[in-house]
């Protein structure tokens, strides 16, 4: 990947993601081909925090219908990043 902003696409904004903020866990949509090491380096570079752990998962796109036409949303990749104790990502804390 080129830069941190090519790896991290957007934060996941959901109640479940907000619940992880108290434990120092932040959830992001990431590039589907990004590795855990690339995700760790991207978060550390973009938000100036120390990353302790990275968990990733693939989310399959849902099948959708528009009239008689079938379609599918794209598959995505989600990363749950845990930062060092005592640290937090200020940019995301303000979204609550």
Curated annotation (Swiss-Prot):
SUPFAM superfamilies: Ribosomal proteins S24e, L23 and L15e (SSF54189). It comes from the Bacteria. Signal peptide: none annotated. One of its GO terms (cellular component) is ribonucleoprotein complex. Keywords: Ribonucleoprotein, Ribosomal protein, RNA-binding, rRNA-binding. The keyword Ribonucleoprotein applies. It holds the Pfam family Ribosomal_L23. GO terms for biological process: translation. One of its GO terms (molecular function) is rRNA binding. PANTHER family: 60S RIBOSOMAL PROTEIN L23A. One of the early assembly proteins it binds 23S rRNA. One of the proteins that surrounds the polypeptide exit tunnel on the outside of the ribosome. Forms the main docking site for trigger factor binding to the ribosome. Belongs to the universal ribosomal protein uL23 family. NCBIfam families: PRK05738.1-3, PRK05738.2-4, PRK05738.3-2. Contacts protein L29, and trigger factor when it is bound to the ribosome. Part of the 50S ribosomal subunit. This is Large ribosomal subunit protein uL23. It comes from Thermus thermophilus (strain ATCC 27634 / DSM 579 / HB8). The gene is rplW.
């Amino acid at each position: 990947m080129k830069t941190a902003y090519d790896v991290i696409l957007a934060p996941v904004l959901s109640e479940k993601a907000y619940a992880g903020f108290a434990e120092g866990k932040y959830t992001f949509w990431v590039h589907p081909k990004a590795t855990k090491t690339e995700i760790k380096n991207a978060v550390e570079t973009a938000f100036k925090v120390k990353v302790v752990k990275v968990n990733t998962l693939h989310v399959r796109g849902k099948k959708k219908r528009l009239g008689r036409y079938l379609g599918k949303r794209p598959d995505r990749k989600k990363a749950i990043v845990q930062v060092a104790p005592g640290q937090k990502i200020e940019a995301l804390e303000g979204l609550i």
